[in-house]
Structures are given as C-alpha cells and as structure tokens.
C-alpha cells in the first residue's frame, strides 16, 4: 500500500500540490483500533496499511477522489452514525438497483465509508456482503436513491486502479471542479470558461 500511495503522492506533487497538502498524516494503531471497535469488525490489512499512510484529508479541501472527500477514520465513524440514525428497515432496492453480493437495505453497520460526497453518497469497504459478494469489496451507497453498486473487489484494487488512472492522465486538477476531476468533467468545466 505504501508503494501505491507513493505513486499517488508523486503524481499529486507534480499535478495537484493543493490536494497533496490536504492529505493527513497516517492514523495510529489506537485510532484504528477504536474504529474497529466502533464498527465491530477487524479491518482488512490493506485498508489499515492505507490509513497508516494517510488518515483521510482535511475537510473543506480540494477532493482527492473526484467529487469525493477522502474521509479520516473519525469522519468515517461520524458518517456511519449518521446513516445508522436515519436507518429505514423498510428500504429495499429494486429492479436495476439490485446487485448480487451487496446487501439490499439502507445501511449495514459493517460498511466502512472512506469517501463522502456532499449529496451524501459514499464509497465503503463492505465487510458484510450478501451471498455472492466478497468480504472487503468496495461499494457505492447513494443517500438520495436506492442505489448500491460494486466498484472494486477490494480496497487494494480500488486504490491501485486510481493510481493507474492518475498516471495515464485520466484526471486533472481543477479549482472550479473542487479538486481532481476526470477528463470528461474537466472538458465540461473548461468549456464554461470559453
């Protein structure tokens, strides 16, 4: 995980130093243990190793992941509490919104959010998948819609895929886009200024 973060940090240093500056120092063992106690699970080793490098990013900073704040461990706890407090036992996804391997409900206490969008969507490490899913898979959970989707089979693949995309030039920094944006969004933002 350190090597993956070195790749990301190097790209940020050259292309988006504002984002690099917003990344927090790594979490310590006590912070990680406290979060594991809160969530009632042991985090996957890659997830812990990643958070030992960077414990999220400063709030109100340019986004690392497009349109998503990279959450600190403490913020992950707070987001999870918010979702749990708004729990709807009758909520169910239907039709195209059902994905095999992802629990069909509002919120699972063993979903560990690590990103958050201003509209409430978040990406989570799923430590309680439904039948056909993989423990540690990365999912998207939408606040305003009954949408749950699979993003990556695990956190390492998620982060490595992001590093690969950065190095291929698939993202740009945009002050108007509040941080890193993909090339399609970047072109739309640039058209607004022309």
For each feature predicted by the language model, list its residue ranges.
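Structured loops at beta-to-helix junctions and adjacent beta-edge loops in soluble globular domains
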Residues: 53, 115-117, 128, 141-143, ...
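Short loop/turn segments at secondary-structure transitions that flank enzyme active sites
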Residues: 57, 120, 131, 144, ...
């Amino acid at each position: 995980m350190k090597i993956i973060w070195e790749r990301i940090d190097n790209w940020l240093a050259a292309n988006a130093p504002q984002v690099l500056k917003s990344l927090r120092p790594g979490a310590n063992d006590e912070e990680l243990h406290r979060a594991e106690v809160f969530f009632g699970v042991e985090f996957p080793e890659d997830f812990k190793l990643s958070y030992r490098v960077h414990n999220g990013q400063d709030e109100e900073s340019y986004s690392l992941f497009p349109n998503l704040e990279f959450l600190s461990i403490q913020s992950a706890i707070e987001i999870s509490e918010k979702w749990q407090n708004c729990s709807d036992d009758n909520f169910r996804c239907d039709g195209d919104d059902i994905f095999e391997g992802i629990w069909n409900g509002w919120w699972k206490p063993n979903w560990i959010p690590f990103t958050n969008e201003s509209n409430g969507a978040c990406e989570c490490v799923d430590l309680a998948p439904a039948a056909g899913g993989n423990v540690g898979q990365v999912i998207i959970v939408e606040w305003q819609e009954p949408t749950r989707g699979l993003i990556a089979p695990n956190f390492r693949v998620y982060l490595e895929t992001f590093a690969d995309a950065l190095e291929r030039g698939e993202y740009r920094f945009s002050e108007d886009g509040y941080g890193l944006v993909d090339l399609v969004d970047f072109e739309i933002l640039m058209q607004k200024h022309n």
